[in-house]
């Protein structure tokens, strides 16, 4: 279920403050954040965010196509190593 339109998109206050501060100072350094739940807004276009995936920070450069998505969608938390049997089937053939 999506968020109500009357509530508007969610973004953590501290992340918005960091974004506006970087925009005013024209700072190009990546913005470090743990806020995977924040929605990407048009004000964030052109910035790089280091999004934490639980282990390391993944750099995410925001473009127009990212608007409306969550920051966490671009920093995967799980690594898929493949199914156990599929490797042995390839070797056997």
UniProtKB/Swiss-Prot annotation:
Cellular component terms per the entry's GO annotation: cytoplasm; small ribosomal subunit
Keyword flag rRNA-binding: yes
Highest taxon listed in the record's lineage: Bacteria
Cited InterPro entries: Ribosomal_uS19 (IPR002222), Ribosomal_uS19_bac-type (IPR005732), Ribosomal_uS19_CS (IPR020934), Ribosomal_uS19_SF (IPR023575)
SUPFAM superfamilies with a match to the protein in the record: Ribosomal protein S19 (SSF54570)
Pfam families: Ribosomal_S19
Gene Ontology molecular function, alphabetical: rRNA binding; structural constituent of ribosome
GO biological process terms on file: ribosomal small subunit assembly; translation
Gene3D superfamilies registered for this protein in UniProt: 30s Ribosomal Protein S19, Chain A
Keywords carried by this UniProt record: Ribonucleoprotein, Ribosomal protein, RNA-binding, rRNA-binding
UniProt xrefs under PANTHER family: RIBOSOMAL PROTEIN S19P FAMILY MEMBER, SMALL RIBOSOMAL SUBUNIT PROTEIN US19M
Function: Protein S19 forms a complex with S13 that binds strongly to the 16S ribosomal RNA.
Family affiliation: Belongs to the universal ribosomal protein uS19 family.
UniProt-recorded name of the protein: Small ribosomal subunit protein uS19
Organism: Helicobacter acinonychis (strain Sheeba)
């Amino acid at each position: 279920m999506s968020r109500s339109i009357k509530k508007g998109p969610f973004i953590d206050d501290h992340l918005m403050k960091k974004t506006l501060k970087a925009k005013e100072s024209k700072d190009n350094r990546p913005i470090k954040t743990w806020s995977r739940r924040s929605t990407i807004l048009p004000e964030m276009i052109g910035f790089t965010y280091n999004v934490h995936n639980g282990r390391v920070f993944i750099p995410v450069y925001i473009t127009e196509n990212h608007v409306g998505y969550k920051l966490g969608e671009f920093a995967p938390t799980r690594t898929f190593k493949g199914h156990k049997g599929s490797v042995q089937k390839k070797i056997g053939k």
